[in-house]
Curated annotation (Swiss-Prot):
Role noted for this protein: Probably participates in a plant defense mechanism.
Family listed: Belongs to the cyclotide family. Moebius subfamily.
Source organism: Oldenlandia affinis
InterPro entries, per database record: Cyclotide_sf (IPR036146)
Residues in cross-link Cyclopeptide (Gly-Asp): G1-D28
One GO term of the biological process aspect: defense response
Mod. after translation: This is a cyclic peptide.
Descriptive protein name: Kalata-B12
């Protein structure tokens, strides 16, 4: 549910603990 300091595209998130909720990465 928290935001990651990352945006996601086809390749996903730089932080492997985050998931893509386009266009942002989220974690918990």
């Amino acid at each position: 549910g928290s935001l990651c300091g990352d945006t996601c595209f086809v390749l996903g998130c730089n932080d492997s603990s985050c998931s893509c909720n386009y266009p942002i990465c989220v974690k918990d």
